[in-house]
Structures are given as C-alpha cells and as structure tokens.
C-alpha cells in the first residue's frame, strides 16, 4: 500500500506489446525516484500472453501489477482492426477500473495520477470521479502526436477520404505529409477504428499533461511547436528516449544463441532484421526478402514469423503458431548458413543492437524499435507495415536523415533486387555512411538529453514535481 506522503502513480497501457514496453520503461524510470509508488494496470480481452507476462515479470518488485478482468468484446467482428479492439478494450475496462479505484480509495491508497496511453482517454471519466489527475503518455513521436492533436480539426474541414487530398498536410513543426501516408487507422473514415480514434483525440484536451517519448535532437521543430501555448492544448513534456537499455535483459532469453553468434562475426558486419512484436509479411513478400538477403551476400540475423496476409497479425501475440521455418525458400538455410542466423518469433533485440558486430537494422519503424536503434547508434532501413509506421518513416528518411527507405513495386511487394540494393547501400555505400554518421550524432544527443541537466531529464523533473504537488494537495485536503 502506498504511504500517505508518497506520490502514487497508476499507469495503464492499452493492449499490445508495442504499448506495454514503453509503459514498463516509464514505470522503471518512476521508481528510480524513490519517492514514487507505481501501480501498473493491465487491461485486455484475454488473459495476458506469455510475452506480456515475461515483460511484466522483469519489473522491480516495488511495482505492483493489477490485471483487470478481460473486457467483453464478443460483439466485435473478428475482422475488426487491431486499433478498434485495443480502444474498445480500454473503454470497456472502465467499470473494472472504477471498481479498482473504489477498492483503493477504501484502503486509502488511491493514486494521485492516472497515466493512460493514446487509446485510453475514456479512463479520464473514472479518474475525474475519484479526483485523480489524468495524463497521457504518448509512446510514439512528436510528429504523430501533433497529427493526433490536429485530427479533430482535420475531420471538420476535410470531407473526402484523406488519401484523396491533393496537397500535403502541413502541421507546424512537422514533416509535410500526403494523405496516403497518414497512419492506417485514419485511412477509412467509415471504419470504427477511425471513429474511436477521433473520439479519443477529441478528449486529449482533458489531460493535465502529455508525456511524449521523443527528444529535441530528433524532433526539435515539432517539440517546439507542441510546447507553444494554445487553448485546449495540454502541456507537452518530451521525456524520451524511454527504452530498455539493460545489458542483461531478463525479458527475453537468448535461446538461439544470437549473441554468441554475433561474438564470432567481424566488427560492424551484421544486418539485423525484425518487424517488431506485431509485424508479419505475406508469403510472397517473405520469400522475396529471403532471396534478397541470400543474394546480397551480407551477414544477417533475421527474426522470422509465419507469413500472414494481415501485416499486423501478431500484434497481440508475437509468437508464431506454426513453424515459420517451413515457409523459407528451399535451400535458403544451407545457402546462408555461413553468413546468416534465422531466429523464430523473438530475439534479444536490445543486446543485438548494442553489439559491436551489428551495423544496421532493417525495421518496420515501430517507435520502440526506432528509439532502441538510435540509442545504440545503429542506422536504419525503413520498411513500414502498419499503424503510424509510414509517418515514422517520413520523419526518419526525409527530415532526420537516419534511415534509408525500401521501396515496394506497384503491386505492393518489395522485390529481391530492391532488398539487395538497399542492403548494399546501407552497408557499403556513401549514403549508408552519411546515415551512420547522423545516427551517431543522435546517439550523442541521447546522452546529453538524459544527463542530469539534459532537456528530457528537466522535462521529466517538471512533471514529477507537478505530481508530487498534487499528492501533497490531496493529503492536505484529506487531513482536514
């Protein structure tokens, strides 16, 4: 139970590993400040997956995890988008959250602050009823946050589907973006996912503040614009990068010997390939990537999942149900056995990116993976699949210069020749060297912003001070 004078913070991510992982890092950062008590509140439509439990088990024992009863989504079609399921799970968890807060209130251990993620704004109703201060931790970047804050206005002023917009959208401080590159969730305005996201973004103004997982060296213009005061815009705190930097990451066992294999490779010679906890490729695309890697002649570690026609099919459970090796081209493993290591479902990504033999990362550009690569100074090949990954790619390729973009053909398939081209460009070409230098600069920027006097540390300190003050105010009210 939280001590009366100790600020008690409850944090509640939406379902999916990509949302859970940064919230776990936020919880760890909070308890490093020994005057905070943290409770992780976990919602879902099923009991937590093995991968989720392993991440939660890595938390310090001082952080309590509370699992809410599964939300009832029996009326939601199986074809519904993952965002629909995630947002409905959050909203339909409100009764269970209310019951939890009621119980904590009786025990005098109610949190002073509730931090939800981008899909959890409906939890504000419960927070306000219990006089708990509502905040958002936006686990993506400042460019996408700016888009989310702009979405209600965009919805009012644009009548067509966004992909038909003839001019790029220009939000202050952000990379201009064409409608077809907007995040997937808004590409069909009749879909429930769009309506639910719009509903959430309209409620962002109710938050007392928004923490964003980015930093000024990476997005100086977007962060500056977000921090300009405006009506109905909460204070934005850039506190990133919040990533797992542990050299002994207990979440993920190295069952397939990735690190010992890397130990035997030359310095800066290995390309790491992973599409995150949620990404999958179609059978045809899986095959083209495999052949392209073999034909490139470069060393690689490739994390594979069984192909699927749905690119986000492993979003809620990153482990393949079928044997992914059976989908590899005949002879692929023999052809690449001297230079490649193929790993099913999951690998110790943080340690792989930190290893001196790793020289590049072919990634879906999920924000957690992007930050992990930047923190370790590893240049990127951008292969966006779903969610806001096209927007992340635009930021990294066109604005920051930290990634090369891989290009699909008109049929949507990245051909083997393109795989060979971009892999060689990163690992051999002048363009790859320039990107490598830029990422090394960003890595140095990370050290600066997270230092004692760094901008992210100061920003985090500001929000912590607000939370301490709010807890003190609550204590004074209850003592009278």
From Swiss-Prot:
Keywords: Glycosyltransferase, Transferase
Protein name listed in UniProt: UDP-glycosyltransferase 72B2
GO-annotated cellular components: endoplasmic reticulum
E.C. number(s) listed in UniProt: 2.4.1.-
Molecular function GO terms recorded: UDP-glycosyltransferase activity
Similarity comment: Belongs to the UDP-glycosyltransferase family.
Enzyme class, UniProt record, top EC level: transferase
Residues at which UDP-alpha-D-glucose binds: 277, 347-349, 364-372, 386-389
Keyword GTP-binding on entry: no
Gene3D superfamilies referenced in this protein's UniProt entry, alphabetically: Glycogen Phosphorylase B
InterPro entries on file: UDP_glucos_trans (IPR002213), UDP_glycos_trans_CS (IPR035595)
């Amino acid at each position: 139970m939280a001590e009366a004078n100790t600020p008690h913070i409850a944090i509640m991510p939406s379902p999916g590993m990509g949302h859970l992982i940064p919230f776990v890092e936020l919880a760890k950062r909070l308890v490093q400040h020994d005057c905070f008590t943290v409770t992780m509140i976990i919602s879902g439509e099923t009991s937590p997956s093995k991968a989720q439990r392993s991440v939660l088990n890595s938390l310090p024992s001082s952080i309590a995890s509370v699992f809410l009863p599964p939300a009832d989504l029996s009326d939601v079609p199986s074809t519904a988008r993952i965002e629909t399921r995630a947002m409905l799970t959050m909203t339909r968890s409100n009764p269970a959250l209310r019951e939890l807060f009621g119980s904590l209130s009786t025990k005098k251990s109610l949190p002073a602050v509730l931090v939800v993620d981008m899909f959890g704004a409906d939890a504000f109703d419960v927070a306000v009823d219990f006089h708990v201060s509502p905040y958002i931790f936006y686990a993506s970047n400042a460019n996408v946050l700016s888009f989310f804050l702009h979405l209600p206005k965009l919805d009012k002023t644009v009548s067509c589907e966004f992909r038909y917009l003839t001019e790029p959208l220009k939000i202050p401080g952000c990379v201009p973006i064409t409608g077809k590159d907007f995040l997937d969730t808004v590409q069909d305005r009749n879909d429930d996912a769009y309506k639910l996201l719009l509903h959430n973004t309209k409620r962002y103004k109710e938050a007392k503040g928004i923490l964003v997982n980015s930093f000024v060296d990476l997005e100086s213009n977007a962060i500056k614009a977000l921090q300009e005061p405006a009506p109905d815009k909460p204070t934005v705190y850039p506190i990133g990068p919040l990533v797992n930097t542990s050299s002994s990451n207990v979440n993920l066992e190295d069952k397939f010997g990735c690190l010992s294999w890397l130990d035997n490779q030359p310095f800066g010679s290995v390309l790491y390939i992973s599409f995150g906890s949620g990404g999958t490729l179609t059978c045809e695309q899986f095959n083209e990537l495999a052949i392209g890697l073999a034909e490139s002649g470069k060393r690689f570690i490739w994390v594979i999942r069984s192909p699927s026609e749905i690119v986000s099919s492993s979003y809620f459970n990153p482990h393949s149900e079928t044997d992914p090796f059976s989908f590899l081209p005949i002879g692929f493993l023999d052809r690449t056995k001297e230079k490649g290591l193929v790993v099913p479902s999951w690998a110790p990504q943080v340690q792989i990116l930190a290893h001196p033999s790793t020289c590049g990362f072919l990634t879906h550009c999920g924000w957690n993976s992007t930050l992990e690569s930047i923190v370790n100074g590893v240049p990127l090949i951008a292969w966006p699949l779903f969610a806001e990954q096209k927007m992340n790619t635009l930021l990294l390729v066109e604005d920051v210069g930290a990634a090369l973009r891989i290009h699909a053909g008109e049929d949507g398939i990245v051909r083997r020749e393109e795989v060979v081209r971009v892999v060689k460009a990163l690992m051999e070409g002048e363009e790859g060297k320039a990107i490598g230098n830029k990422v090394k600069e960003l890595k140095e920027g990370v050290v600066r912003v997270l230092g004692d006097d760094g901008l992210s540390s100061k920003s985090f300190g500001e929000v912590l001070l607000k939370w301490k003050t709010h807890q003190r105010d609550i204590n004074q009210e209850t003592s009278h």
